[in-house]
Amino acid sequence: MGLDLARATRPLPELALAYFPNARSVDSDRDPGAGAVQCGDVAEVCSVTNDPDHGHIPVLLDRCVELLAPALTRTDPDGTEAVLVDATLGAGGHSERFLTDFPALRLIGLDRDPNALAIAGDRLAPFGDRVTLVRTRYDGITSALAEAGVRRIDGVLFDLGVSSMQLDQKQRGFSYSADAPLDMRMDPDALLTAAEIVNTYDAKTLTRILRDYGEERFAGRIADKIVRRRAKQPFTTTSELVELLYEAIPAPARRTGGHPAKRTFQALRIAVNAELDSLRAAIPAALAALRPGGRIVVMAYQSLEDRIVKQAFSTVTASRTPPGLPMELPGHEPEFVAVTRGAERADEQEIERNPRSAPVRLRALEKVGGRGS
């Protein structure tokens, strides 16, 4: 029987952790607001719309299932079933499909956004104690598994970047197409906001953020204008920043490469949420948690993320035999093999159905050796 989370009287993770008797809900030391989703939030958030995807159509859903399926069909002699970590739970679209297609699967869903956890918790309630939801960034995967009493996992999925659901919540400040507070926090309990960065960081630091995280070629020019503008009046809304960006970026450049605010907003969002630092820590942690035969699928939407994923995958698929030796040394074979040929792209049919999939780069590996059996 499905659980009615909107009427439940206990926090969602306590209910969801029934499958893992040693697990409990605790505040993560990585995120100040980490912990349980309060079920009262579910009714408030889920009453907004009847759309289960909340505007976020799962990207490359069939391909993700196809790639992870070989790792999720095992049954151990001790009776334990396969475990999948959805490291970017969002509205729960990918997770729902996996739980439906693999009836014995146990799922651990991670997200730092309590609104996302509330929405996904309501959506996944029919799967009962097969589901564990944890409020944490994806680099908290090791702690989340420890709290759930899970040593090794069979699959892990990352769908990186900001979700359509978050973009559509205009008050969050992620979108440059609507006026809203200059916020951009994926975790609303986090302290750092885009407004604080724009209003307090010096020109040199702002330039570095815009250049390194947004690949903005006018980073220095924009940073200088920000510093001069805020001396008269601090920035408080997205529209104020967008107006400055139109002034800072030369007209010929504004006519190419998409919206002139796109790169600056990306850079600020990445800085506010420490997205790249989190990803650099999360990928090795996820790889270490996989048992032999386990698989990882990562979908990235911009070059900075994909570069990190590509480098991490390249490292673990390389031989550990010292160069120059004529043969592979026993025990020095690669721990992982690629199950995609480089990065896969969405085809025209997928992009037509879901335009958000246009920039996606999907990479996948399988663990073939090493520790973790």
UniProtKB/Swiss-Prot annotation:
Gene Ontology MF terms: rRNA (cytosine-N4-)-methyltransferase activity
Subcellular location(s) per record: Cytoplasm
Compositionally biased residues, Basic and acidic residues: 343-355, 363-373
Catalytic activity: cytidine(1402) in 16S rRNA + S-adenosyl-L-methionine = N(4)-methylcytidine(1402) in 16S rRNA + S-adenosyl-L-homocysteine + H(+)
EC number(s) from the headed UniProt entry: 2.1.1.199
Binding site for S-adenosyl-L-methionine: G92, G93, H94, D111, Y138, D159, Q166
Pfam families (alphabetical): Methyltransf_5
Assigned GO CC terms: cytoplasm
Organism of provenance: Mycolicibacterium smegmatis (strain ATCC 700084 / mc(2)155) (Mycobacterium smegmatis)
Ranges for region Disordered: 343-373
Keywords: Cytoplasm, Methyltransferase, rRNA processing, S-adenosyl-L-methionine, Transferase
Protein name in UniProt: Ribosomal RNA small subunit methyltransferase H
A GO BP annotation: rRNA base methylation
Function recorded in the entry: Specifically methylates the N4 position of cytidine in position 1402 (C1402) of 16S rRNA.
RNA-binding in keyword set: no
Family: Belongs to the methyltransferase superfamily. RsmH family.
Gene3D superfamilies in alphabetical order: Putative methyltransferase TM0872, insert domain (1.10.150.170), Vaccinia Virus protein VP39 (3.40.50.150)
Ribonucleoprotein listed as a keyword: no
InterPro entries to which the protein is assigned, alphabetical: RsmH, SAM-dep_MeTrfase_MraW_recog, SAM-dependent_MTases_sf
